[in-house]
Amino acid sequence: MENKDIKILIQEVLEKGYLMSLGIVDEDGVWVADVYCVHDDDLNIYWMSDPDTRHSQAILKNNKVAGTITVSNKGEDNLGIQFEGVAQKIEGVRWDLAKKHFTKRNKPEPQESDDVLDGDSWYVLQPTKIDLICERYFGFDKQIFEL
């Protein structure tokens, strides 16, 4: 399978998935937080979080992160991604992301007068490497996609 086909399968996981397990490292060790996420065409992953949470604070000090998104259910072939990259806080309301975020969670589309952040901030993870697990096509042989 060609690299473009691997990217299409990765995009399928990002489109179907909504919950990312985000791994960070801080002065207290390793930590994982589940966050609702959306993505863009360049495979960047976005989420909203309270800036005071452990994972948000850790990203300010060490932006190297890892994560997983799995979209398979019991009885289905495994389909998911594991990835590493760099994360950072981004400024602004980002209505484009807010609309995608609310739609993905089956919530009404926000109005521009709504306080969609409610004290939270947007963050972006730019992957440098993505491992695809697609049991239907590859068994448990991970397909590596370098960015």
Describe these PLM feature segments.
Residues 50-54, 104:
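Short, solvent-exposed aromatic-acidic interface loops
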Residues 53-55, 74, 138-140:
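Short, surface-exposed beta-strand-loop junctions and turns on beta-sheet-rich folds
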